[in-house]
């Protein structure tokens, strides 16, 4: 039970982190969210549409990209339309827990940073990706995402944005809280999980104790007895709580009258 929970925590904790030390000189919070690049090609007798999604500061949103797997930084979806409807024929995902390599881009014409992904599982193949984030001082909110090439092995993409320019800490925009895609667990869910675990341990442990003491013919009878006692306890809770409230309120009224 705990292994899936730990796996989920690891997968969600290592998405493209805008507060990573390697990105400290940039302002990637300006790009936070899911961005899409779409291309349509006429492939008679069909039409092929390819959409690449990029999740910045958070994984790709399942609401904006329902065909993509969960917890991916980059996702490519290929759809083919023969008559009226598009059919998904190919999905490529670069999982958020892949190790990322950050390489500064410094040349006479361009500055920024390159983020590399290596060894993403795609069927029986391993695929790689390199995304170049290039500084564009003149772009204020009008960022450009471009897919340079994809050959079923290597993805090259480029993002021109003000976010890729070296920025002082005072000028940085703080990352907003990631969009809840229904993939995150709130405090209520954790309380529910621990309650279920506690009740399971209480019921099974109590039945085992009764059985070992010899108070029950078999384990099933012991389990039934513990369940009946638990149901009686739950039924008696409202009366118990009401009695406590009446005593407390009655005590307060008595003190007030004495004064």
From Swiss-Prot:
Disulfide bonds listed in the record: 18-57, 68-75, 135-165
UniProt cross-references to InterPro entries, sorted A to Z: Autophagy-rel_prot_27, Man6P_isomerase_rcpt-bd_dom_sf, MRH_dom
Main location: membrane
Keyword Glycoprotein carried by entry: no
Cytoplasmic face of the membrane: 206-259
Compartment(s) of residence: Cytoplasmic vesicle membrane; Golgi apparatus membrane; Mitochondrion membrane; Preautophagosomal structure membrane
GO biological process terms held by the UniProt record: autophagy; protein transport
One Pfam family cited in the UniProt record for this chain: ATG27
A GO CC term attached to the entry: Golgi membrane
Lumenal side: 16-184
Gene3D superfamilies in the record: Mannose-6-phosphate receptor binding domain
Bilayer-crossing regions: 185-205
Family indicated by similarity: Belongs to the ATG27 family.
Protein name as catalogued: Autophagy-related protein 27
């Amino acid at each position: 039970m705990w292994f899936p929970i730990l796996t989920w925590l690891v997968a969600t904790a290592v998405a493209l982190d805008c507060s990573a030390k390697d990105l400290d000189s940039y302002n990637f919070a300006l790009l936070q969210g899911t961005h899409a690049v779409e291309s349509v090609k006429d492939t008679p007798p069909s039409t092929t549409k390819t959409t690449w999604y990029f999740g910045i500061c958070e994984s790709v949103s399942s609401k904006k990209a329902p065909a993509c797997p969960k917890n991916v930084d980059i996702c490519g979806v290929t759809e083919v339309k023969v008559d009226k409807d598009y059919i998904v024929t190919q999905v490529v995902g670069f999982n958020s827990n892949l190790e990322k390599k950050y390489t500064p881009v410094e040349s006479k014409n361009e500055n920024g940073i390159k983020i590399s992904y290596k060894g993403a599982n795609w069927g029986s193949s391993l695929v790689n990706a390199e995304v170049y984030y290039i500084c564009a001082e003149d772009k204020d909110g009008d960022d450009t995402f471009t897919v340079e090439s994809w050959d079923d092995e290597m993805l090259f993409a480029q993002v021109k944005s003000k976010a890729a320019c070296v920025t002082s800490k005072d000028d940085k925009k703080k990352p907003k809280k990631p969009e809840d895609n229904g993939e995150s667990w709130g405090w209520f869910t954790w309380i529910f999980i621990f309650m279920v675990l506690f009740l399971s341990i209480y019921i099974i442990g109590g039945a085992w104790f009764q059985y070992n003491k010899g108070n029950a013919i078999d384990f099933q009878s012991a389990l039934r007895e513990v369940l009946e006692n638990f149901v009686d306890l739950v039924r008696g809770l409202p009366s118990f709580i009401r009695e406590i409230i009446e005593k407390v309120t009655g005590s307060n009224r008595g003190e007030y009258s004495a004064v």
